[in-house]
């Protein structure tokens, strides 16, 4: 059976993770040759959820921010979904919820935009309002956060916590663990996830 060739986006990802230096020409060629990049940049929809999830996919590929298509997605999110206090799934400040805020923070970090106002607002939202324990009340003033399955009811949504911890770990790596508050939140999140066996997704433990 003939082995399938490795997509050039994966080659780019491995080189990036191993710290291998690549020239601008090499990066450009690897992006250009990638079937995955071609598929991800083939279509476009002028809608919040399309742009959110497309950016999340794109952000897994190093240097993808160089493409005009990626910049188009970033511009849509920055102009339409980045509220004053964090990322919102519809652009309204009262519709900031943990999972979407965290996913977009991580995507912006991977796209070398961790220091942007949009990413910093998302990070500040986590620092101020995310809870990592049961029976704690968030000081976030909008009720949307208790809809959609209950992001922060008596038992905070495990998806929101998991994505928030992942985003914080990605951000911490980018800034070389220079933010002690971020490190503290990561520790709190991991302790909570292990304590409640969240990695097993069991509701009876």
Where are these regions (language model features)?
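Preference for long, amphipathic alpha-helical scaffolds in soluble/luminal domains
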Residues: 1-205
